[in-house]
Amino acid sequence: MTLQSLVIQLGAASESTIPTTLSRAIHAQVMQWLSLGDAQIATAVHDSQESPLSLSGLIGYRRKQGIQLGDDFAVRISLLDSNLIQPLLQGIESSHNKSIYLGKCPFVIRSIYSLPGTHALVNSSDYTILVNTSQVSNDITLQFLSPTSFKQNQNIQPFPLPDLVFNSLLRRWNRFAPAELQFPQVEWQGLVSAFELKTHALKMEAGAEIGTVGWVKYRFSDPEQARIATILANFAVFSGVGRKTAMGMGQVNSKLRIKN
């Protein structure tokens, strides 16, 4: 099963003012592309309780006076299910010469980057490669690139506690990885050894979502937990972590310190 992150480069098709967030508009556009490629798969994704998509917000420089014709932007789309790759690319290709609208702002598709090495944000792997990693780290740093939060009981928790982060990743891994590669439930014993975080409000159509951005270093003294956490940290680059990862939240990068 392949994991894929691809980047769609967009050009502004007119002068306009972009809303603070386009999370829902980007999600809707990706779903439309999927539907153009395979309506049945798009319906299954829409009805899924655990989204196989992780989406960035609109990446690019926003002028204070509004965007200008031709300004460059990008969207990163990560897929946790290899069955989505072909229909998504087919849907995007069918829109290649047409304007698309995000929050009433028109854009044209300039490029589609899907091969590693063609763009810094493009990545590819598979579940077998990740689970068979020979580089296990006891110290794992996760960088939270967009506001991140978690459900904790009936509340929303913005601080990325070890059990919330790695249970979120474990649940998503077990939902999409082949059965033979899935993990049992883990009673995490990891600790936060350092962090630099701030809260940030991501404006959504239904109101602001409060989440955390910054970095956290986690330490796992148990070798088996360190192994699983390393696998899940590498997976997080594709899956995101926490709530609303298909709406631009929980975008993650990871750094592992490998002991010699």
How does the language model describe each region?
Residues 1-260:
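RNA-interacting cores
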